[in-house]
Amino acid sequence: MEKSHRVCKNCVANHYWLHMDNHGKSFIKVMITDFKNGVTIPAKFARNFGGQMSGTVKLETRNGKTYEVQVAKELNNLVLRSGWERFASAYELEKGDILVFIYSGNSHFKVWIYDPSACEKGLPCIITEQLPRVQQRSISHNNHTQLKRNAKSAKLYVDSSGHSKETSEINPANSPSWKPTERVPSSEELDEPVDLANVQKATKSFYSLPRMCNMTSAQKAEVDALEKRIKPQIPFYITVMDKASATDGLLAISKDYAVSYLLDKNETIKLCHSGRSMTWDISLDIDTDDQYALSTGWLDFIRNNHLQEGDICVFEASKNKRGVALIFHPLKQSHHPKPPGCVPSTKFPRHGVSKPNYIVSRFTTLSGQLKIKVEAKVQAIQSEIPIFVAVMRESFIRGRSRYMCFSAKYAAKYLPREKNKIMRLRLPNKSYKYKAVFKINNKVHKLGGGWGKFVDDNKIKLGDICLFQLMKNKKKLMMMVHIIRKSEFC
């Protein structure tokens, strides 16, 4: 009887794996040990699916964002390796987190993420990061109009056919890196045979210039001469360094230009200098609003090439089987002084009322009563330095190793680069200062030791909002912390 029962169970298992539709089959992984560099696909799942998965799988999270991860065979195991670290970093995976991988065919998995409490990982009243933006019209040589709508700029581009196309800017980045010893690809290598079926030949460049910031006749002539000499198959991308490009670590790129001539997914591209032997690996980032920008690596590029606000940048795009490259062509007269009436880059709308000056934590957006409360508080604080807004999550307030993370955008611009400094925390109208250790681990900036005492003493709970105001002109690193209780908006 026992033997027949065992045989029956084996039959059911074989029927499940060999004869039933594979869509919806799943496996679970608990994040333990060295999970940030890769995770192993369970052996039983790998045995039954190994032949159906290509060398690359796609991981899709609940917010719809998809990541490509390489599957490596190591010691007879299938391991999610190249690309996994980026996925783990993007969703701030922590020890004890539980991930459910649900197969949906064609080497594609939907991934549900849970925290150690077995509840789906997420923030109260939070969906995904949404960056404020302003829209403006960009120009050809003879058309100089601009329309701003919010706080960052989206632009209209004029292509070679004379049709305008709309695109958008995005925000921020992590600290970049460049590789001075890498060889710059030759023009022959970059222009080796490629499939140009979807690439239109164009004789006119894409321009992205603010209102009234016209190029000089000499600059136009230099671009025209460059086009005639190089005869690019892909239009040049021409823009001007505004304040955000020079200081915020990003350069907005036309969505239409990026999709047509560069990439339509998050990827690293090679940035070269036409007259130097350096190359830089630059991230092309696409946010949830389909806004495109060059981010990680961009700051190093502008520092190494001494670019500044007002400089004209000419980029030549090139594609081959090995990837995408942008070649930077400096103009002899590259700097563009601001003429009277030129609209500078700004974080605020043009019509007098300033947008609340704050930065929210990653993958968060504020809406409803929460947004009203936060913006009212930020307006009341009137800080010159943007306020960092964080919604309290499990890892921030519970457990022995509690810590509070700052976004890479905020940290890169406003926080020190040295780790293990003491951060002093104060409440408004209180003189007592808490001491927490400011740490930097794997490019993650966070408050560690001492943060737990601040949480306990001030009875901070899951879903509460903390607004961190960096105090200016202080000899010691200090933040004023304003607290909005969850009960005030939910």
From Swiss-Prot:
The keyword Transcription regulation applies. GO terms for molecular function: DNA binding. SMART domains: B3 (SM01019). The keyword Cell membrane does not apply. Gene3D superfamilies: DNA-binding pseudobarrel domain (2.40.330.10). Residues 24-117, 236-331, 389-487 bind DNA. It is found in: Nucleus. Residues 169-178 have a biased composition (Polar residues). Its main location: nucleus. Residues 161-191 are annotated as: Disordered. It comes from the Eukaryota. One of its GO terms (cellular component) is nucleus. Keywords: DNA-binding, Nucleus, Repeat, Transcription, Transcription regulation. PANTHER family: B3 DOMAIN-CONTAINING PROTEIN OS11G0197600-RELATED, B3 DOMAIN-CONTAINING PROTEIN OS12G0591400. This is B3 domain-containing protein LOC_Os12g40080.
